[in-house]
From Swiss-Prot:
UniProt keyword annotations, A-Z: Electron transport, Heme, Iron, Membrane, Metal-binding, Photosynthesis, Signal, Thylakoid, Transmembrane, Transmembrane helix, Transport
GO molecular function, one term: iron ion binding
Topology relative to the membrane: Single-pass membrane protein
Cited Pfam families: Apocytochr_F_C (PF01333), Apocytochr_F_N (PF16639)
Gene Ontology CC annotations of this record: plasma membrane-derived thylakoid membrane
Lineage of the species this protein comes from: Bacteria, Bacillati, Cyanobacteriota, Cyanophyceae, Synechococcales
Disulfide bonds: none
PANTHER family referenced in this protein's UniProt entry, alphabetically: CYTOCHROME F, PTHR33288
UniProt protein name: Cytochrome f
Subcellular location(s) per record: Cellular thylakoid membrane
Length: 317
């Protein structure tokens, strides 16, 4: 019964996030998105065998991501994993229609097996305040230890708090006390490549041939066609979508790979690993007992020393 309830909750959560995703496209088509959604739809796991998080396949620029997790946590306890996605305030980028739009952010946290998103009834008031307006989704029904967030407005979500529930090895022998690794990724802004391999308009467009720019045509939607004539008189047409700014003009001589536009991208992706220790309560008790024992030993040594000094003083030594 409990498993059926969890499955229904997962499907409901995914349905809500999908509705939000679709409605955001319909009602806010100019917003610039950072899509963990794409990774979810195209990769069985968000982390490749090399350790690279797959978001980096589309978001080619690198920018820092910072994570804060506690050094150690107790069994069956709720703790915060904080992902920080810094960028300059009021920064805007090129949207899909070529207009300037605010940046969006997204994040993925790959928790160790047994760790998962804490149920809301165990969230503290502080966590509820810090996660207001944030929707968490499991990467898949089978992987409740992988949590994705986004797209979210970047100006108010440069820090994303993930409420995490640790496992209890005393009730589930599949898990153990000790050190665990977390894999974390954070992104701001749109990608440069779609999962299909096609370029977005948020990237530098380059020439695929060498020659002289014969002419530049402006299309009705604001995009360009750059016609390049090689030494044999053959014309190659390079399509440049709306958004990037041309940095070439007619009669310019160019080589293969030379940029035709500026680089409009201002966002980027970053990933890092973190560690957390699942602390055994018996180990904590033992450690406390050890420190108490050391403290008592020190006190006894001091008392013994004073006693010896008194005896020596009485004997005139």
């Amino acid at each position: 019964m409990k498993g059926l309830k969890n499955q229904i909750m997962k499907k409901t959560s995914l349905f809500i996030c999908t509705l939000l995703f679709i409605s955001s496209i319909v009602f806010y088509p100019k917003i610039s998105f950072a899509y963990p959604f794409w990774a979810q739809q195209n990769y069985e796991s968000p982390r490749e065998a090399t350790g690279k998080i797959v978001c980096a396949n589309c978001h080619l620029a690198q920018m820092p991501t910072i994570a804060e997790v506690p050094q150690s946590v107790g069994a069956d306890s709720v703790f915060k994993a904080v992902v920080k996605i810094p960028y300059k305030n009021d920064l805007k980028e090129i949207g899909a229609d070529g207009s300037e739009v605010p940046l969006q952010v997204g994040a993925v946290v790959m928790l160790p097996d047994g760790f998962k998103l804490a149920p809301q009834e165990r969230w503290t008031e502080e966590i509820k305040e810090e996660t207001e307006g944030v929707y968490f989704t499991n990467y898949s029904e089978e992987q409740d230890n992988i949590i994705i967030v986004g797209p979210l407005p970047g100006d108010t979500n440069k820090e994303i708090v993930f409420p995490v529930l640790s496992p209890d090895p005393s009730t589930n022998k599949e898990y153990h006390y000790g050190k665990y690794s977390l894999h974390i990724g954070g992104n701001r802004g749109r990608g440069q490549v779609y999962p299909t391999g096609d370029k977005s308009n948020n990237v530098v467009f380059t020439s695929s041939t060498a020659g002289t720019i014969n002419s530049i045509e402006t299309i009705e939607d604001g995009s360009y066609q750059v016609n390049i004539e090689n030494d044999n008189g053959e014309i190659t047409t390079e399509a440049v979508p709306v958004g990037p700014q041309l940095i070439v003009k007619a009669q310019d001589k160019i080589n293969v790979g030379d940029p035709l536009t500026n680089d409009p991208n201002v966002g980027g992706f970053g990933q890092l690993d973190a560690e957390v220790v699942l602390q055994s309560p018996y180990r904590v008790i033992g450690l406390i007992a050890f420190f108490i024992g050391v403290g008592l030993t020190q006190i006894l040594l001091v008392l013994k020393k004073k006693q010896v000094e008194k005896v020596q003083a009485a004997e005139g030594i």
